[in-house]
UniProtKB/Swiss-Prot annotation:
The modification Phosphothreonine is found at residue 439. It comes from Pongo abelii (Sumatran orangutan). A zinc finger (CCHC-type) spans 261-278. This is 5'-3' exoribonuclease 2. Possesses 5'->3' exoribonuclease activity. May promote the termination of transcription by RNA polymerase II. During transcription termination, cleavage at the polyadenylation site liberates a 5' fragment which is subsequently processed to form the mature mRNA and a 3' fragment which remains attached to the elongating polymerase. The processive degradation of this 3' fragment by this protein may promote termination of transcription. Binds to RNA polymerase II (RNAp II) transcription termination R-loops formed by G-rich pause sites. One of its GO terms (biological process) is mRNA processing. Signal peptide: none annotated. Residues 445-458 have a biased composition (Polar residues). Gene3D superfamilies: 1.25.40.1050, 3.40.50.12390. InterPro entries: 5_3_exoribonuclease (IPR027073), Xrn1_helical (IPR041412), Xrn1_N (IPR004859), Xrn2/3/4 (IPR017151). GO terms for cellular component: nucleolus. It is found in: Nucleus, Nucleolus. Pfam families: XRN_M, XRN_N.
Amino acid sequence: MGVPAFFRWLSRKYPSIIVNCVEEKPKECNGVKIPVDASKPNPNDVEFDNLYLDMNGIIHPCTHPEDKPAPKNEDEMMVAIFEYIDRLFSIVRPRRLLYMAIDGVAPRAKMNQQRSRRFRASKEGMEAAVEKQRVREEILAKGGFLPPEEIKERFDSNCITPGTEFMDNLAKCLRYYIADRLNNDPGWKNLTVILSDASAPGEGEHKIMDYIRRQRAQPNHDPNTHHCLCGADADLIMLGLATHEPNFTIIREEFKPNKPKPCGLCNQFGHEVKDCEGLLREKKVKHDELADSLPCAEGEFIFLRLNVLREYLERELTMASLPFTFDVERSIDDWVFMCFFVGNDFLPHLPSLEIRENAIDRLVNIYKNVVHKTGGYLTESGYVNLQRVQMIMLAVGEVEDSIFKKRKDDEDSFRRRQKEKRKRMKRDQPAFTPSGILTPHALGSRNSPGSQVASNPRQAAYEMRMQNNSSPSISPNTSFTSDGSPSPIGGIKRKAEDSDSEPEPEDNVRLWEAGWKQRYYKNKFDADAADEKFRRKVVQSYVEGLCWVLRYYYQGCASWKWYYPFHYAPFASDFEGIADMPSDFEKGTKPFKPLEQLMGVFPAASGNFLPPSWRKLMSDPDSSIIDFYPEDFAIDLNGKKYAWQGVALLPFVDERRLRAALEEVYPDLTPEETRRNSLGGDVLFVGKHHPLHDFILELYQTGSTEPVDVPPELCHGIQGKFSLDEEAILPDQIVCSPVPMLRDLTQNTVVSINFKDPQFAEDYIFKAVMLPGARKPAAVLKPSDWEKSSNGRQWKPQLGFNRDRRPVHLDQAAFRTLGHVMPRGSGTGIYSNAAPPPATYQGNLYRPLLRGQAQIPKLMSNMRPQDSWRGPPPLFQQQRFDRGVGAEPLLPWNRMLQTQNAAFQPNQYQMLAGPGGYPPRRDDRGGRQGYPREGRKYPLSPPSGRYNWN
């Protein structure tokens, strides 16, 4: 969803929706990697039923990553995708269903955004290549050092589009991957797997939502199914709320801004290509072969709990004294609808509503003030009440002028602060900064410039002599680097962006000045604002778009042909008289075919993915559709600072002209291209342990060509139709690996079959309600009346999925170490930097039980009697504290240890404060609960939950 910063805004406003994933890493023994056993209980204290993968969010980072070296070829890309799915699977561990959805042919409304994105990617890629070559030639001409240019084929990410050979090969590889895991991974043993590849029309996330909607409408659906959806798009949050499922979680990779990226020329960090100077890299050691490698830090995953977001929204949207019955489900639907006004993949956002300016909060406040007058909610099951929406939009229009003026004031204030900050930093800089091997550096800074040189003066002197001998003359104006070596490119002028005043983008509209509406329509639409007919046409198209998008989220695609025919949105104050505007769409429309979509979204530079005769239509000057493929196009910054925030002014594709031109080249398609140009469906896979396995085998043995109903009692209530798969994977047949580096499956027990969701009439309405029998999860947020009803008890926030999760405590040795190095009181501690004291014994007297296991720890043979032990006393007497759980039975080995240590007196081994003991602590814990120890005036507290590392 095209809402930049939406997730950041959401996670800051509602912080409890985020939970960090607990991930069990694969182990390695003697060079052999041992995979994670996903059949074991989930370490996140929650069990998921269904896992849905929006595959395009996995394909892109695996094929062209930004923070690590890119795969060398297509085979490595496929292996990277497999490993990414394995990692997600080991975190979520679904028990019923794995649904993998790849983007197929998108609706016409989405194709405009895809076209803009692909044209931009092509243009930016060519511009980056030209700039890179220019800087390289400039550096080499001045004597700079650059690594030899690596000759490799550039990966065009535009190939990740339905209809290309890459996507066809990906589908084959995923079939092999599913068969391999169902045969060999115990976590996949009883799993149903559905693959919806790029031949099935529809966006990946919307194919997933369509599956959920259709299954919810079946009588055998479990209303308490726990769904987990993987994807990074903001619209997944809206789609998850639109299902009205009580248990819905989103897993996504945690976004860490400002990740360091290497320079494309010298592979060094800290600068971009335009700032590269071709300096030699300072290696940390003499033989540092890894100095030129990129850091490959593995990203972390987080859970986004939509049930907690529903709690937040219920509190925020609850209103008293309504003239109608309050319904939290309808209120959440209205909130989802209002989020569309700040932008999405199908419509531009309104000029007065920016997510960074808390536009959603403003809309919610207006909604709560106006809803008493509307007489009801804005939406119902994906259909919009335009009369009520008009009241909301006109209320926004009344404050548009003040919004524009405040935006200008905030921008001017920010620029003024930034300018003062630059001046202050420039003023505080020293007039002279020493450099070279005699430069003073902070103690212990191993990465400081010159630290390696200064550590070996003889080597440094030798290298300087050799360098002087190899350089016959050095100009007095030559600049030197921090290690004393001359810079090959001295005297480079300061770049314009380093100056105190940065040029601001030209803004001819000036929304903060009077006459902003006239200037806006003149500059953006080339029309007069007084032209009421044109303004109404723009508003009507936008209103149709709002209705289409909401229907798309709640009911499915209302029309495959509809699209918004303008680059810009109208003003909120223009939404007058929209109550009478039609919001119906043409029925019976069909999606584009894959190769037709490629012709509609690809620039001419990506024509190599198309058949030769089709490609010619994009570049031949005599082509009837040559105007669809401009070599260059304007980008309107639209008041923004960066080009990626601007609007690409591309011509819209005329579907009628495109189809007419393609009719002449359709006969040129080969049988393989014709197959790739056809629309397909979903495929279902099961292993030999699944109840459906024998049922599907019987269908293949009978050879029936008629669709057969899926027996819901054999697959957790899933319903639909089965039909035989021409490219089926069958038991006792070898599954050949499409990736040469992976082995063939010679002992296969997996079977696949075509699967089709339950079908409904075109005018059927899926009810946006919580199903009967659904149980809401326990509340996570602090009750608003907690202070009144808690009787003084302190609120304990829920940190994970389970409030009764058993904390894992540190053992005795860890507490001794922490107690030694941490401060003793309000001061810093006299041994805060000292190493832990050496242990005089091995083993732990009390070892905590591992959750879910009954492991008996081995008693160390060298554990000596207590009267001969002279080590430091333990800081804490280890105990078990289980919140909300009854006391566990005392195991025999625990009773034995207690009996053995019954005569132990904790104060008989006290030592003086010093390296071998512990300084006395302040007696400030008298009010804490615990078991008093002899010799102390305060009881000890239980192990802190601060170190709850499970």
